Amino acid sequence: MNRILVIGDLLTDRYRFLKPLRSDPANNVALVVESEREEMVDGGAGNLVRNLKSLCGEDVHFWCGTGKEKPTKIRYYVEDRFILREDREDVIKHDENVIDEFVDLIEDEDFVVISDYHKGTIEGADIVRIISRCDELENVTVFADTNHVFPEHQGVGWLKINLETARECVNKNDKNLARIISEKNNSNVIITKGEDGFIAYLKELGQLIVFTKDKNKGFVDAIGAGDTFLAGFVSYLARHNTGELPALVYADIVAHLSTSQLGTIDVVTAEAADKEYKNLKTSEKEEEDTLYVHRTIDNV
């Protein structure tokens, strides 16, 4: 299996579960609550790494900022209903030593993942440097997950973005978004669309994949779903080293499983994802250079 090297913004995800007691006598709208429990896990690129390790083992290596204070997202729940999110320390100090160490350790055959939450760990020049180093080596595959597409992403092997980012990059709203961004960026492109599936363009095959699926009646929330999609995709390629379409479908399965549980508290296991993949039901239709894939979901 390929080594997986990840660099990105390590965040902290905290979840506070509150029990309502009564209304505040000074303001009937406000609740008086008591804390029932709290969960804290690695978020951002840390969530990606946790799921990668769960899906494909321990040969996953992570570089992140070195500051004591990490950006923290605190989500508050009352009777399991998500009420609000509080963000703290939203910036990570850039450390050139982290970039130096990461670049120096990349080897032939590695999978290199750039998970950029735009908090400060990675700067544009770092992305160029990482991609350039990988181009000098043999069979290194580079994946970039970003909320903004910049010129520095030019030539990355796989660019994964969401639909909002794609529309920001190209002012269009149709299935050809992935193709246009691919031609502009010289990359394979994946555009995730949440519960509506994804669009992907495989540049060497010149093939557009439009993936749709049934509604997930067990949907809880989409927190961290982008990370789990990428974890599923990278882990499948690392384990099987072939098959972009199966890897994309597997990625959607992993994201689907993550949206059926609350937040980023629990990872998706290889056992659960492999079982779901084994029982997969899809239909395909090909029209010119576009492959339409629909997944049927058993919502029991």
Predicted region positions:
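Residues immediately flanking
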Residues: 9-10, 163, 193
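Short, well-ordered alpha-helix to beta-strand connector turns
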Residues: 2, 108-109, 155-157, 185-187
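Active-site metal-binding loops of divalent metal-dependent hydrolases
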Residues: 9-10, 117, 228
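Conserved N-terminal subdomain of the carbohydrate kinase-like
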Residues: 2-4, 11-114, 125-128, 272-300
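Conserved phosphate-binding/catalytic region of the ribokinase-like
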Residues: 125-155, 168-300
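Short hydrophobic/aromatic-enriched beta-strand-loop microsegments
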Residues: 60-62, 158-163, 208-212
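Structural beta-sheet core signal
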Residues: 5-6, 62, 144, 191
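Conserved beta-alpha-beta core of the PfkB/ribokinase-like small-molecule kinase fold
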Residues: 18-27, 72, 76, 80-92, ...
